[in-house]
Amino acid sequence: MIKNRKIGHVGLATNDIEATVQWYLEVLGFEVIGDFKNPAGAPIKFLKRGDIIYEVFQPIGGATAPGKIDHLCFESGDIEADYQYCCEQGYTFEKEGIQELPTVWEKGARFFKIMSPSGEAIEFCQVM
């Protein structure tokens, strides 16, 4: 079992990132704490209110299910060890291997996602 992991953020896919972000700011009092683009140029914004962090992103080509929570992210202090453990347990991965996202935060992030039995993605992410 992967223990003692803090929830890092909840990922939300949208087809209109500006309207979605504005709604969270005005209606729920969130603030923007990160404004990035992925390597393909698609926008990603991190919003925070108290201990809650949302990653709002607009995939190129549109969200497959806009408004649906895309993933739940847990922080990782050792992404390689967590990935190895999940491999040993035989979990189903969204994509094989540890993914890198160099365009977020100061030094980028590394992550992988496993799939739950009901289909949601569970992400483990290490900010570099």
Give the role of each language-model region:
Residues D35-K37, P59-G61, I98-T103:
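Short, solvent-exposed loop/turn elements at beta->coil junctions and helix N-caps
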Residues W23, E80-Y85:
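Short amphipathic alpha-helices within nucleic acid-binding modules
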Residues P43-K45, D70, G108-F112:
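Short beta-strand micro-motifs in enzyme catalytic cores
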Residues I2, L12-I53:
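Core segments of cupin and vicinal oxygen chelate
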Residues E26-V27, Y85-Q89:
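Short amphipathic alpha-helices in soluble, non-transmembrane regions
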Residues M1-A19, D70-L72, S76, C125-M128:
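N-terminal beta-strand motif that seeds the catalytic metal site of vicinal oxygen chelate
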Residues M1-K3, C87-M128:
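Vicinal oxygen chelate
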